[in-house]
UniProtKB/Swiss-Prot annotation:
Has antibacterial activity. Keywords: Antibiotic, Antimicrobial, Defensin, Disulfide bond, Secreted, Signal. GO terms for cellular component: extracellular region. Disulfide bonds join C29-C58, C36-C51, C41-C59. It comes from Mus musculus (Mouse). The lineage of its organism: Eukaryota, Metazoa, Chordata, Craniata, Vertebrata. Only expressed in epididymis (corpus and cauda). This is Beta-defensin 37.
Length: 62
């Protein structure tokens, strides 16, 4: 019984991801102190790149 719980724990931990949306473009955007948005950037912000594997926009404040 304890062994089956241990196997279930290992299976659960193997499928766990720390941050599944943090890809290279997202990390680069955040390191430049910009913000990631899924839709349009707020007013007074420029689009300077992408986030979330091209699905979002990296916004830089003017």
């Amino acid at each position: 019984m304890k062994f089956s719980y241990f196997l279930l724990l290992l299976l659960s931990l193997s499928n766990f991801q720390n941050n599944p949306v943090a890809m290279l473009d997202t990390i680069a955007c955040i390191e430049n102190k910009d913000t990631c948005r899924l839709k349009n950037c707020p007013r007074l912000h420029n689009v300077v790149g992408t986030c979330y594997e091209g699905k979002g926009k990296c916004c830089h404040k003017n």
